[in-house]
Curated annotation (Swiss-Prot):
Domain Fe2OG dioxygenase residues, every copy: 166-286
PROSITE patterns assigned to the protein according to its UniProt record, in alphabetical order: FE2OG_OXY (PS51471)
Keyword Iron: yes
Molecular function as annotated in GO: 2-oxoglutarate oxygenase/decarboxylase (ethylene-forming) activity; dioxygenase activity; metal ion binding
InterPro entries assigned: DIOX_N, IPNS-like_FE2OG_OXY, IPNS-like_sf, Iron_ascorbate_oxido_reductase, Oxoglu/Fe-dep_dioxygenase_dom
Protein name as annotated: 2-oxoglutarate-dependent ethylene/succinate-forming enzyme
Pathway: Alkene biosynthesis; ethylene biosynthesis via 2-oxoglutarate
Organism of provenance: Pseudomonas savastanoi pv. glycinea (Pseudomonas syringae pv. glycinea)
Quaternary structure note: Monomer.
Leading EC class: oxidoreductase
GO biological process, one term: ethylene biosynthetic process
Length: 350
C-alpha cells in the first residue's frame, strides 16, 4: 500500500469547524483503508530514532541478560522470540513491553492488582528513551481521540474521559531476518485496545487487512470469539510501505465495540524480511479501572472492563510466563471482580 492517507494533526484540538472536518476525514480513512498516517515533526522524529536506537542496543545484549528483564508482577519486560502465541502458533519477534511503571510502594501494587508493578528496565538510557517517546505518542493519542469524537458528532472528551491515567503501553519489537524455513513474524490478529500508533524502520513487513464489505469479524472481547488467525491466508492483505516522517494509526477492539462496528479493529500481521526489522507499537488505552460502553446504543448493558480485558488478553498470549503463573497462584484475578463491581456502580450511577 503506497497511497496511505496522511494527515497533519493540529497542536491543539478545540472543537472548531476545522477539527470536526478533520475528525470526519480520519473516520472515513479508517472505514476505507483500516489505517492512516500522521505526519511527525523533527522533535517527534528524533524521539522515534532514539527509541529505535535504544532497542537495537538492547537486542545486542546476551540472552541471559535480556531474559532477566522480567517480572512476576507486570507483563512489562522481555519476551523471547517464540514465546508469544497467536492462534496457537508461536510468533518470532523479540519484544520488550513497557506497561505503566509503578513502584512497589504504589497502593495498587501493594494491594496485589494483576499486571501492576515496576518495569524491569535494562538500563537508564533505555528507560529514558522509551518514556520520552511514549509521552510524545500519548500527546498524539489524546488529539486523535478528541478528533474521532468530533467526527462522530460526540462530545470532544467522549474517549479521553476514559484515558485519564490511561493504561498506555508499548511493544518494542525486533524481527529476525527470514530463513528458508521461517517467514512468519506475527500471525494475523487485531489489537485488544482503543488506539494503536506505530513506528517502523525502513525494512518493512507489516500487512493490514482493510474493511471488506459483508465480512464477519470476530469480536475479540467476547470469551467465545477470537480474531487471532482469522483470514491469515485470505486476500486482501495490503503491505504498509515504510515511509519516513510518519506514524501509522489504526483502531483496536475497544473502538470497534464502542462504535458498534462503525470503526472496525484492523487485522494485521507481520512477515519477516531479508533483514532484521525494528518497530514500536504504542497502545493509547483506557484507565485500568474504566469500563467502555456502546456509544450509539445507550440502552445496551454490555460493558468491557478494561483491566479485565487487558489481563485476559495477556494471559492468553503468555500462558507460561512468570506473570501469568503469579496471577493464578496468588489469585490476583479476584481483585478484578471487585474493580468491575465498582466500575459498574459508577457507570449506572447507583
Amino acid at each position: 500500500m503506497t497511497n496511505l492517507q496522511t494527515f497533519e494533526l493540529p497542536t491543539e484540538v478545540t472543537g472548531c469547524a476545522a477539527d470536526i472536518s478533520l475528525g470526519r476525514a480520519l473516520i472515513q480513512a479508517w472505514q476505507k483503508d483500516g489505517i492512516f498516517q500522521i505526519k511527525t515533526d523533527s522533535e517527534q522524529d528524533r524521539k522515534t530514532q532514539e527509541a529505535m536506537a535504544a532497542s537495537k542496543q538492547f537486542c545486542k545484549e546476551p540472552l541471559t541478560f535480556k531474559s532477566s528483564c522480567v517480572s512476576d508482577l507486570t507483563y512489562s519486560g522481555y519476551v523471547a522470540s517464540g514465546e508469544e502465541v497467536t492462534a496457537g502458533k508461536p510468533d518470532f519477534p523479540e519484544i520488550f513491553t513497557v506497561c505503566k511503571d509503578l513502584s512497589v510502594g504504589d497502593q495498587r501494587v501493594k494491594a496485589g492488582w494483576p499486571c501492576h508493578g515496576p518495569v524491569p528496565w535494562p538500563n537508564n538510557t533505555y528507560q529514558k528513551s522509551m518514556k520520552t517517546f511514549m509521552e510524545e505518542l500519548g500527546l498524539a493519542g489524546e488529539r486523535l481521540l478528541k478528533l474521532t469524537a468530533l467526527g462522530f458528532e460526540l462530545p470532544i472528551n467522549t474517549f479521553t474521559d476514559l484515558t485519564r491515567d490511561g493504561w498506555h503501553h508499548m511493544r518494542v519489537l525486533r524481527f529476525p531476518p527470514q530463513t528458508s524455513t521461517l517467514s512468519r513474524g506475527i500471525g494475523a490478529h487485531t489489537d485488544y485496545g482503543l488506539l494503536v500508533i506505530a513506528a517502523q524502520d525502513d525494512v518493512g513487513g507489516l500487512y493490514i487487512r482493510p474493511p471488506v464489505e459483508g465480512e464477519k469479524r470476530n469480536r475479540n472481547w467476547l470469551p467465545g470469539e477470537s480474531s487471532a488467525g482469522m483470514f491469515e491466508h485470505d486476500e486482501p492483505w495490503t503491505f504498509v510501505t515504510p515511509t519516513p516522517g510518519v506514524w501509522t494509526v489504526f483502531p483496536g477492539d475497544i473502538l470497534q465495540f464502542m462504535t458498534g462496528g462503525q470503526l472496525l479493529s484492523t487485522p494485521h500481521k507481520v512477515k519477516l524480511n531479508t533483514r532484521e526489522r525494528f518497530a514500536c507499537a504504542y497502545f493509547h488505552e483506557p484507565n485500568f479501572e474504566a469500563s467502555a460502553y456502546p456509544l450509539f446504543e445507550p440502552s445496551a448493558n454490555e460493558r468491557i472492563h478494561y483491566g479485565e480485558h487487558f489481563t485476559n488478553m495477556f494471559m492468553r498470549c503468555y500462558p507460561d510466563r512468570i506473570t501469568t503463573q503469579s496471577i493464578n497462584k496468588e489469585n490476583r484475578l479476584a481483585h478484578l471482580e471487585d474493580l468491575k463491581k465498582y466500575s459498574d456502580t459508577r457507570a449506572t450511577g447507583s
